[in-house]
Amino acid sequence: MSDLLSGSLSHDKVTRFLNGKNLSSKDLWEFIKPEIRKHEENSGGVLILDDSIEEKPYTNENEIMCWHYSHAKGTHVKGVNIISCLIRYGDITFPVGYEVVHKDILFCDIETKKVKRKASITKNEHFRNMIEQSKKNKIPFEYVLADNWFGAKDNLEYINSLEKKFIIGVKSNRTVALSKNDKLRGKFQKVSTLDMKDGQSIKAWLKGIEFPVTLIKKIFTNEDGSTGTLYIVSNDLTSGADHLYTIYQKRWQIEVYHKSIKQNSSLAKSPTKCVKSQSNHIFSSIIAFCKLEILQINTALNHFALKYKLIVRANQIAMAELQNFREGVA
């Protein structure tokens, strides 16, 4: 890299950067704020939140590089757990906040007698804090979208208290009442036991929550041909099931983000070993994603196409240089 940039960037300069200022979500916002203001829309914006684990099985353990439960794998894995908050307007998506889960409390597990870690700030607390910060930053959004791992009672109540709409997944064992009278009498049943057709929506009351929600059931087909059932809830009682599900599908853009920061922004290639440098590397990967997104807007090429185009062009130049060497020898 130093040779490529004629010495303007050195290994020592990168090392000093990674071990310098503690870079955070606040710095991300300062960087991306001008782009958000350029593309923001007063209606139709969706705030998307989700977490992802970058596995690092061979890196020394610390408060961010530790064991986390992976709901994708159904087991605990060693790595970094990052919660991200994205804003989406049409086809444009930018991260506006992120938090790295810090398991900064050591405790002894009574059953196993082993020392374990837990976080002083939970993922659900980070979830609510990032929504609050987005509102403070005056980011226009109409809906909050998340999967069922963030469908906790406190999260739904918090979003509703902000007078914002949510469309969030709930687990199949969540219990609901089908009328206000049933709610008052304590007559609740699991959503999985409800006689609902694919795409159907009903008005329901989640246990422990005062306000009613629209409950939607969707049946989907997996890549292996098996089928699954998705339940989502919304405090938007005026929109139909098809409209709400169409909006909810915008949530999948965060999966593209997770894939891109891992494969195109070198999130997984951090050689750092201490918390500060590891955290600053994560920040740098997210900034790189933002720059790729800006290029995508300007070129109409997605991140993977941009990367492929650069690799092809670099190889063409290398092949031409190789040919020059051969002709020189001849």
Question: Over which residues does each language-model region extend?
Answer:
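Flexible, active-site-adjacent loop/turn segments at secondary-structure boundaries
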Residues: 15-16, 67, 148, 265
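A broad structural signal for alpha-helix termini and local helix breaks/kinks
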Residues: 5-6, 40, 265
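Short, basic interhelical loop/turn and adjoining N-cap
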Residues: 3-17
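Active-site-proximal, Lys/Arg-enriched surface segment
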Residues: 17-97, 200
